Amino acid sequence: MSAKEIRFSNDARDRLLRGVELLNNAVKVTLGPKGRNVVIDKAYGAPRITKDGVSVAKEIELADKFENMGAQMVREVASKTNDLAGDGTTTATVLAASIFREGAKLVAAGMNPMDLRRGIDLGVTAVVKEIKARAMKVKSSSEIAQVGTIAANGDAAIGEMIAKAMDKVGNEGVITVEEARTAETELDVVEGMQFDRGYLSPYFVTNAEKMRVELEDPYILVHEKKLGSLQAMLPILEAVVQTGKPLLLISEDVEGEALATLVVNKLRGGLKVAAVKAPGFGDRRKAMLEDIAVLTSGQMISEDLGIKLDNVTLDMLGHAKRVLIDKESTTIIDGSGEKAAIQARIQQIKAQIEETTSDYDKEKLQERLAKLAGGVAVIRVGGATETEVKEKKDRIDDALNATRAAVEEGIVPGGGVALLRAKSALTGLTGENADVTAGISIVLRALEAPIRQIADNAGFEGSIVVGKLAGSNNHNQGFDAQTETYVDMIEAGIVDPAKVVRTALQDAGSIAALLITAEVMIADIPARDSAPAAGNGGMGDMGY
């Protein structure tokens, strides 16, 4: 075990504070509409240019181990805020640095760190309650666009694109962001359920020009196992032929003789048919097949359920208005499933999302939910260079997360105004002793930090801006750094999601309060470079 270096009390907190300030100084320049970009060197490829606070924070690693501990703790604030709210990472960093800076001063002056921490917790709880009380529900598509525009650094085109996407697929729908192959940024909406499995044979194609299968009003057979022979299916195939409708066959795989028989029937015109592999793997495949069955009002043919292929009747098959299949994907449009059954399935998936602790499982469940609930929208991000595309993609990700948070918990005035006005919740609030009350006053001062930083980044004196707003009776009055004027933030469309503001303060207060209570720091002593090897062993005395 290597030797350790130990630091105590004020010396320890000073080193922590130095690390916190270094990280904060790198991140805070990105705050607000006139915030600057940060250029990050990469081990390979072009440098990355970003205005995303958490991306900057994640790149910072300091040489001094004690300073690095402080930086890493605040980096944790940015990451946690990003995970919970998806935006507000720079605000969280600025708040954490302000709370820790003031707290460290008071501890150095002889106040009790544990009482200060209690005061900070009291202050944060009161402010969060105030923010929740003042939040306004998002009512229209234009309000969603406003939230997206602010989070995308004032890019109205991005805000409108996200609002359009949410309008098409609903609040539960999946909106994904991908890199485009062109210079244009565009929105592509897939209605109905789409999964990433294409036709098993190009002979199934009905539209040769677009190389895709188009089935109108088809029956859908959902089968769990592989199909090697069609012997057991003959009764149901004959029943489908009698109706004159097409058939889509979804199963684990269709092999050899079975596939050849289907292709021959299709080419001879006896049966309009197409076959695709089932999406997913293992248990997830079974769940997705059940989703398709619910969506199309059919039954999954599974021996686990006691249903065999030779017993299948027409009423066990699913049904949809239209099915489109290309080489890589299958889209089922307007399935005839009952609304109540689909809604029950949606609630079941939502319950699973609440229970799961795995991010990967959560993401896959969200995808299933979206496919049942509304559809999928894809924003394809274009740009002149790869660096520009990546920077734009960061902003769209932030905007997307912000709009989802706004729909969830409502909106508050943006530009740091919500936190500044929430100071009223702390007026007259005192603790059980002077040190706890001092902890509350730390939060009171920190609430001004974001708006001061936004003003500083716009070239204004933060103190003057805060002073001017303090004299206004309009709770929505704020400083628009873009136009450099004082406006009603709600009327001007400068809004923040309440969830983002609340999460930023809670995470910042939690980590900063912990840092204040740190009394001892322990780190490995850096290993000295070993001395160079002294010549060839055993050859030293040979007189050469």
Curated annotation (Swiss-Prot):
Database matches in SUPFAM superfamilies: GroEL apical domain-like (SSF52029), GroEL equatorial domain-like (SSF48592), GroEL-intermediate domain like (SSF54849)
Cellular component, GO annotation: cytoplasm
Subcellular location: Cytoplasm
Domain of life: Bacteria
Alphabetical list of CDD domains matching this protein: GroEL
Residues binding ATP: 30-33, 51, 87-91, 415, 496
GO biological process terms held by the UniProt record: protein refolding
GO molecular function term, any single one: isomerase activity
PROSITE patterns: CHAPERONINS_CPN60 (PS00296)
Keyword Chaperone assigned: yes
Entries under HAMAP family matching the protein: CH60
Its biological purpose: Together with its co-chaperonin GroES, plays an essential role in assisting protein folding. The GroEL-GroES system forms a nano-cage that allows encapsulation of the non-native substrate proteins and provides a physical environment optimized to promote and accelerate protein folding.
Family, per entry: Belongs to the chaperonin (HSP60) family.
Record NCBIfam families: GroEL, PRK00013.1, PRK12849.1, PRK12850.1, PRK12851.1
Subunit structure: Forms a cylinder of 14 subunits composed of two heptameric rings stacked back-to-back. Interacts with the co-chaperonin GroES.
Name of the featured protein: Chaperonin GroEL 3
